[in-house]
Regions:
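Active-site-proximal alpha-helix that buttresses catalytic centers in soluble enzyme cores
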Residues: 1-79, 87, 112-115, 119, ...
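Non-DNA-binding regulatory cores of transcription-related proteins
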Residues: 87-119
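Domain-level recognition of soluble alpha/beta enzyme cores
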Residues: 109-142
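A short, amphipathic alpha-helical segment
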Residues: 34-37, 106, 124-125
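Residues that scaffold the ATP/ADP-binding catalytic core of kinase and kinase-like folds
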Residues: 14, 104, 131
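A polyampholytic, Gly/Pro-enriched intrinsically disordered region
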Residues: 88-101, 130-146
Length: 146
């Protein structure tokens, strides 16, 4: 299973690579991790963009899952070779940015969907199985992010 998690809400201003999550973004990332835990998602590894907002999202979401976060520059926003990145891995969580993730979602599944900040997609064998907004993730996690 391939999971795509778009970074949660980040602060405006400052250098793009260094924008941290807002308080709301922190809650969104924590909710994503709890929701994944609640549904029994089993990731072998998490790859994250090096941009601060994505890395913080990955660390917060992966904490309850006990999954290692590996920083990979290919997820910083440009198109990347998914097969090369995930070769030899089982179930993978990628944490990154749009428009790359929405384009990847379309390329893999044909879905015409745009991922929201803090949104999660689950893909298996070219089929989009899950597409959740942050509010839906927080409901699954049993917490409020607003």
């Amino acid at each position: 299973m391939l999971w795509l998690l778009r970074h949660a809400e980040a602060a405006d201003g400052g250098p793009d690579d260094e924008r941290p999550l807002t308080e709301r973004g922190i809650r969104q990332a924590e909710a994503a991790g709890r929701a994944l835990q609640t549904v029994g998602a089993n990731m072998d590894v998490c790859f994250s963009s090096p941009k601060l907002r994505a890395l913080q999202t990955a660390q917060l979401a992966c904490a309850p899952l006990g999954v290692e976060v590996i920083v990979d520059r290919r997820l910083a926003g440009e198109p990347f070779d998914l097969k090369e990145l995930t070769a030899g891995q089982g179930d993978v969580l990628l944490v990154g940015h749009d428009p790359s993730f929405s384009l990847l979602l379309h390329d893999l599944t044909g879905a015409q969907a745009r991922m929201k900040k803090g949104g999660l997609a689950g893909i298996s064998k070219g089929e989009l199985l899950v597409l959740l907004r942050p509010t839906e993730l927080s409901a699954i996690a049993g917490q409020r992010v607003a």
